[in-house]
């Protein structure tokens, strides 16, 4: 009955819980000896395969036996899958035992899951790990906690094992390894002993030299890296300093140029005025002091090259300050004829000024229609639209003149007077047209041309007011 109960437990672990059941895990879980756990697993596999030949069970076996390797006999213990069991048995010279190690539903690719299952169960039963084991040793007694702590300290204080010793330990298999060369306890005497000692000393010196050379190479590489880094930072610092110096030089040069421009802008005004005021006196003095004048001319030529930009700026500013005359678009409306009336007549509203300016302040009158006579044969007074100039200051503070059409009443006598005034106005108009040519000649004649233009505008305004 007990065996049947155990088999039911194993079936529940494998099929229902889908666990990997090893003989160690089963012995700790059920509290049975390891040999009994191995027998239980074997019985479960046999019964399950007899009942259902298509049952999905994967079994791993623990195989042990003697093996001859490199001419030496050794004892081998291996965990293999069921499909590789016969191949491993054939390699063994003598097969000592074959036991069921684990049962699981899935095929295992490696031994990792088996190790994890045994590791977890052993960790939980670490104090009683040999309770259900088949290996027993009466001399193996658990140590006291004080002794265990002292042994741990001694292990920490022991010097570490050299890698050469570790390599020699790894090469040994089951106590058999390559023969270790025995060191000669007695040194050879005479000449052979001298040569042997010299060879040993040379080998030691060679090892020391290789170590020192390796250290020197490492140190030289580090020094080179440090030198490269220091050189890089020094070059960067030099570049930043050069950039700062260039910026300071540019700022100083710009400040000096601004100062020179301010100094140079003042003398041209004072120099041009006396030239315009008294050109005859300058001609007389130039004849008397020709050698001195030649030197001054050379200096002036140099200055003129520098002041050309400033003078162009001044002329542009002067042009902006000149009066801007705006002429309205030509109106094609006919003159209106209005009969005489004793009361005062109302003037028509002026048309808006056009945007296109023109420098000609010439009065323009529309063509006069033939005089209209009344029924009594008397001439009637007629109104006429006349172009008149109006001056005002704009937002920038400049004087602006605009031409506006205004209606005026006129008779035959007034028409004759206006024809005369128009003949008087014509010569100033020609003078106004010549202004741009005079401006092109140079900045020296610009001020004189400005004065003439102002006088002509004033004269035309005076005649229009009459």
UniProtKB/Swiss-Prot annotation:
The modification N-acetylalanine is found at residue 2. There is a cross-link at residues 259, 262, 433 (Glycyl lysine isopeptide (Lys-Gly) (interchain with G-Cter in SUMO2)). Keywords: Acetylation, Cytoplasm, DNA damage, DNA excision, DNA repair, DNA replication, Isopeptide bond, Nucleus, Phosphoprotein, Ubl conjugation. Coiled coil: none annotated. GO terms for biological process: DNA biosynthetic process; DNA strand elongation involved in DNA replication; DNA synthesis involved in UV-damage excision repair; nucleotide-excision repair, DNA gap filling. Residues 205-218, 255-265, 281-297, 432-441 have a biased composition (Basic and acidic residues). Ubiquitinated, but not targeted to the proteasome. Sumoylated. Sumoylation by SUMO3 may be predominant. It holds the Pfam family CDC27. There is a cross-link at residues 259, 433 (Glycyl lysine isopeptide (Lys-Gly) (interchain with G-Cter in SUMO)). The modification Phosphothreonine is found at residue 411. Gene3D superfamilies: DNA polymerase delta, p66 (Cdc27) subunit, wHTH domain. The modification Phosphoserine is found at residues 308, 407, 409, 413. Residues 350-360 have a biased composition (Pro residues). One of its GO terms (cellular component) is delta DNA polymerase complex. It is found in: Cytoplasm; Nucleus. The keyword Thylakoid does not apply. A motif (PIP-box) lies at residues 456-463. Accessory component of both the DNA polymerase delta complex and the DNA polymerase zeta complex. As a component of the trimeric and tetrameric DNA polymerase delta complexes (Pol-delta3 and Pol-delta4, respectively), plays a role in high fidelity genome replication, including in lagging strand synthesis, and repair. Required for optimal Pol-delta activity. Stabilizes the Pol-delta complex and plays a major role in Pol-delta stimulation by PCNA. Pol-delta3 and Pol-delta4 are characterized by the absence or the presence of POLD4. They exhibit differences in catalytic activity. The PIP-box mediates the interaction with PCNA. Component of both the DNA polymerase delta and DNA polymerase zeta complexes. The tetrameric DNA polymerase delta complex (Pol-delta4), which consists of POLD1/p125, POLD2/p50, POLD3/p66/p68 and POLD4/p12, with POLD1 bearing DNA polymerase and 3' to 5' proofreading exonuclease activities. Within this complex, directly interacts with POLD2. Following stress caused by DNA damaging agents or by replication stress, POLD4 is degraded and Pol-delta4 is converted into a trimeric form of the complex (Pol-delta3), which consists of POLD1, POLD2 and POLD3. This is DNA polymerase delta subunit 3. It comes from Bos taurus (Bovine).
């Amino acid at each position: 009955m007990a065996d049947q109960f155990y088999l039911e437990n194993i079936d529940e672990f494998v099929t229902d819980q889908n666990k990997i059941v090893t003989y160690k895990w089963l012995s700790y879980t059920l509290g049975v000896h390891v040999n009994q756990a191995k027998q239980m697993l074997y019985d479960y596999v046999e019964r399950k395969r007899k009942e259902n030949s298509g049952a999905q069970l994967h079994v791993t076996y623990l195989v042990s036996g003697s093996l001859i390797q490199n001419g030496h006999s050794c004892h081998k213990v291996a965990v293999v899958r069921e499909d590789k069991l016969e191949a491993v048995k054939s390699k063994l010279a003598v097969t000592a035992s074959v036991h069921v190690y684990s049962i699981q539903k899935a095929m295992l690719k490696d031994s990792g899951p088996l190790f994890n299952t045994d590791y977890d169960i052993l960790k939980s039963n670490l104090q009683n790990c040999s309770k259900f084991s088949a290996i027993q040793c009466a001399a193996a007694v658990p140590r006291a906690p004080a002794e265990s702590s002292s042994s741990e300290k001694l292990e920490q204080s022991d010097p570490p094992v050299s890698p050469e010793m570790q390599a020699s330990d790894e090469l040994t298999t089951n106590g058999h390894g390559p023969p270790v060369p025995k060191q000669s306890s007695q040194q050879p005497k005479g000449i052979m002993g001298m040569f042997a000692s010299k060879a040993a000393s040379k080998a030691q010196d060679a090892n020391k030299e290789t170590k020192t050379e390796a250290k020197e190479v490492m140190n030289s590489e580090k020094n080179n890296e440090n030198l490269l880094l220091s050189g890089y930072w020094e070059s960067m610092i030099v570049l930043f300093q050069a950039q700062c110096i260039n910026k300071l030089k540019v700022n100083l040069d710009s400040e000096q140029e601004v100062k020179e421009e301010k100094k140079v802008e003042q003398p041209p005004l004072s120099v041009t005025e006396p030239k315009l005021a008294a050109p005859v006196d300058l001609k007389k003095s130039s004849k008397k002091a020709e050698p001195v004048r030649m030197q001054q001319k050379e200096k002036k030529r140099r200055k003129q090259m520098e002041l050309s930009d400033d003078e162009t700026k001044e002329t542009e500013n002067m042009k902006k300050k000149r009066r801007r005359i705006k002429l309205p678009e030509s109106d094609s409306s006919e003159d209106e004829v209005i009969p005489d009336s004793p009361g005062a007549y109302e003037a028509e509203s002026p048309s808006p000024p056009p945007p296109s300016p023109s420098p000609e302040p010439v009065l323009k009158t529309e063509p006069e229609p033939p005089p209209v006579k009344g029924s009594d044969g008397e001439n009637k007074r007629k109104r006429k639209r006349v172009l008149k100039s109006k001056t005002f200051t704009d937002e920038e503070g400049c004087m602006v003149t605009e031409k506006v059409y205004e209606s005026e009443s006129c008779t035959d006598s007034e028409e004759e007077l206006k024809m005369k005034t128009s003949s008087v106005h014509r010569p100033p108009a020609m003078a106004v047209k010549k202004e741009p040519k005079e401006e092109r000649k140079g900045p020296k004649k610009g001020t004189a041309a400005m004065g003439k233009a102002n006088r002509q505008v004033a004269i035309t305004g005076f005649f229009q007011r009459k």
